[in-house]
């Protein structure tokens, strides 16, 4: 059976946190960018509890000046 990569939620969350620090972006900054009333979704991304939607990944890639595949961390 062929094995396919899967997204590692925890490592992706750690990567989002690292990219935020590298770009000097706070949770409140992302909350404003996305227009979220509450920041819970961003904290869930950072903790690896869930992933941003594809639309939000596109925005994150733009904000971090990177690509989606550099945000997501996969297991092989």
Regions found by a protein language model. Give the residues of each.
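Short alpha-helical DNA-recognition segment
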Residues: 24-44
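Residue-level detection of the helix-turn-helix DNA-binding "recognition helix"
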Residues: 21, 35, 47, 76
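Residues within the helices of the helix-turn-helix
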Residues: 17, 28, 58
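DNA major-groove recognition helix of helix-turn-helix
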Residues: 45-46, 56, 72-75
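A short, Lys/Arg-rich alpha-helix, primarily the initiator
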Residues: 1-25, 33
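DNA major-groove recognition helix of helix-turn-helix/homeodomain DNA-binding modules
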Residues: 55-70
